[in-house]
From Swiss-Prot:
It catalyses: Endonucleolytic cleavage to 5'-phosphomonoester. NCBIfam families: PRK00015.1-3, PRK00015.1-4. The gene is rnhB. This is Ribonuclease HII. Residues 26-214 form the RNase H type-2 domain. GO terms for biological process: DNA replication, removal of RNA primer; mismatch repair. Manganese or magnesium. Binds 1 divalent metal ion per monomer in the absence of substrate. May bind a second metal ion after substrate binding. It comes from Burkholderia cenocepacia (strain HI2424).
Length: 214
């Protein structure tokens, strides 16, 4: 499990009251994940508490942004957010727990790793991890809620960088191009070379590739 946290900062009551103008009594964090569908690599989650005193223009669902735009927003989010944490669940945890439960685990780690305790976690999707704070699921939240958009960007950029690192170790699969998703070239490499330690053996295409080399 990896976790990246913002430096701990003391929050005044005035600042806390402004985290979400529609919820003046709440400290709200947005939560999202990246990497549920790929055949390789960890699943990554992020939790973000935005600072309304330092607004960030251009936040959106990470999937609709270019890589260049995501990278630029990543730098702004880690600099201007009141608190953030990025966490992950490993390939072994995915294979042991299944991808859904591993995703919930990564989200839980991200929320619990925040340097400021939120009173509400808004989760992208239709279900929430078990948390020590109140949580609500918001379908398409990454396109609707700025803090969830910010979390989606941190999770996506972090995971893409992890897969570039994996490419350095296992160059035959092209992780730097497809980030572990089941593209035609990735599937062809799986059939030719078999899976590596970064592949999720609980996923059917990886199991099929294993069967070919047995």
């Amino acid at each position: 499990m990896t976790a990246i946290r913002a430096p701990r900062r003391r929050a005044s009551s005035d600042v806390q009251g402004g985290f979400d103008f529609s919820r003046p009594d709440e400290i709200v964090c947005g939560v999202d994940e990246a990497g549920r569908g790929p055949l390789a690599g960890p699943v990554v989650a992020a939790a973000v508490i935005l600072d309304p005193a330092q607004p960030i223009d251009g936040l959106d669902d990470s999937k609709v942004l270019s890589a260049k735009k995501r990278d630029a927003l990543y730098d702004l989010i880690v600099t201007r957010s009141h608190a953030y944490c990025v966490a992950s669940a490993s390939v072994d945890e995915i294979d042991t727990l299944n991808i859904l439960h591993a995703t919930m685990l990564a989200m839980k780690r991200a929320v619990e790793g925040l340097s400021v305790l939120p009173t509400l976690a808004q989760i992208d999707g239709n279900r929430c991890p078990t948390l020590s704070v109140r949580a609500e699921a918001i379908v398409s939240g990454d396109a609707l809620v700025p803090s969830i958009s910010a979390a989606s960007i941190l999770a996506k950029v972090t995971r893409d960088r992890m897969l570039v690192d994996l490419h350095e170790r296992f160059p035959v699969y092209g992780f730097n191009v497809h980030a572990g998703y089941g593209t035609a070239k990735h599937l062809a490499a799986l059939r030719e070379h078999g899976p590596c330690e970064a592949h999720r053996r609980s996923f059917a295409p990886v199991r099929a590739a294993l069967d070919l080399i047995r």
